[in-house]
């Protein structure tokens, strides 16, 4: 298998935990957006003090309402743009991680275990060695075989997409 494919797979594996964290951050931002509601903005502008040009405080001019309505529209557009940006970053990242997880699940059980422990759960090679009662040298061989097989899977789908 080409070095390009194996390097790509190794990069995916090494960045797995960071990518999962980014996915969770983006999901949180989508579910709990920091937004100012149009009603809050209109209310704040509605009771704002004037510039002292003879209007009693608290009165609303047509100009103020026009500005508030424009702000409402601008706020809606900004919120929509933010949501679109979050989704456009989240979807490809989720697809990449889901694909990697699926391909890892297709490996032999021993390979899957080593990849999961090392890259998905972040254990050290010494911890994995103790847990699996396997030498680190053997673990590296298993990892290398798994990376080769993953690279073949990615190469196959790359050929199909052409």
Predicted feature locations:
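Helix-turn-helix DNA-binding module
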Residues: 121-138
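N-terminal interaction/assembly modules
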Residues: 1-103, 155-162
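Short amphipathic alpha helix immediately N-terminal
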Residues: 106-123
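C-terminal flanking helix
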Residues: 147-154
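Juxtamembrane/interface motifs at transmembrane-helix termini
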Residues: 134-137, 149, 160-161
